[in-house]
């Protein structure tokens, strides 16, 4: 008994007499093209007869597919008729009236006085003929030749040549059986000889692998680098600091009392750390502790100030820079991750990025601060920005900064203010004033790129990454730093 590939065996079973290969493929739930290799194999082995016949057939054009879905102009025109008292009226204001009338002329349809008016019996006969023509668009094989010729003139269908393949079994189906297809054999198959009854599936190494879209840079990393470029273009110098910070730089140096609610465990990640910790200079510990005890009127704890935490704000980095540089005229910024015990939702995350900056110099005012904030916002492409009065422990006066999101409306993305003397003086800054701000870059990216869920900034979906990168490229090409030198 001859052993055949299962697909070839199924063709032979179904083709005891001449059958169209398309019909056999449909019964097997396969495409006719995928069966061709088995048809050729059957012919080569002499178990299958094959005949090919070239025929002319009609197929829908793109316009034909549209008309099949939306309706022929004359069909839509007639369906808009209003019938009353045995008369049917169609207004010539119909958008397809011109084309419809050209195709209805053979029925004797003529406009008069801005309308087409027909007795209802005539209207029904014409509509029935047009409906039949409309149905043929979904079943071209049953359409009369004159209808097909009309469709061809209207470029609704086109005539093409197709090769029809007919197959017929050359041997009784009982004389063959299907093989068991294997992609691998075991040592037991070889030892028992079962491998002789298997059909090993060949691997065609010449087949090209499927194309996969080229990877794109991560849009959010590109955005962060761009913000860095903008800040440097505005004359700022970048500074950096540790993610694992002591409470002193994260809170105490910013005149945030040690019993402030923001320092509770529900707002700060406290770290159990047995490694070395870089303590702040002794003179700063003493100066900051003295200001806390004098102004907040409580016993300041040096031990608490040295507790390790994951930084909750990148102001910890800029306050370090201020302590190191002291008085003078300079502008610094930092970009980095911060951490807070937030519940993850479309607007909040327990880990996000901040842009922090300070401008140091004598005679700086609140007006300078708002001007600097507006300058940065416009450099990043945010055209609609609002400021609202706010309170922060370490700045006065203070504002919250909002920008308009296309879906979420006005979204707060940062705070700003002028450092209080209780912050600057313990650090040795007495002649200068310090403008300071901290902005949430995740929310800014959402605003600029039209993203309404903060979790999408870290998506791993390749399709979404390509979509958001395309938005980034569009934004980047239309907005941003022009290389100009900006001054306060």
UniProtKB/Swiss-Prot annotation:
Localization: Cytoplasm
EC number(s) stated in the UniProt entry for this protein: 6.1.1.20
Keywords associated with the record: Aminoacyl-tRNA synthetase, ATP-binding, Cytoplasm, Ligase, Magnesium, Metal-binding, Nucleotide-binding, Protein biosynthesis
PROSITE patterns: AA_TRNA_LIGASE_II
Domain of life: Archaea
Catalytic activity: tRNA(Phe) + L-phenylalanine + ATP = L-phenylalanyl-tRNA(Phe) + AMP + diphosphate + H(+)
Presence of the UniProt keyword DNA damage in the record: no
Name this polypeptide is given: Phenylalanine--tRNA ligase alpha subunit
Species in which this protein is naturally found: Pyrobaculum arsenaticum (strain DSM 13514 / JCM 11321 / PZ6)
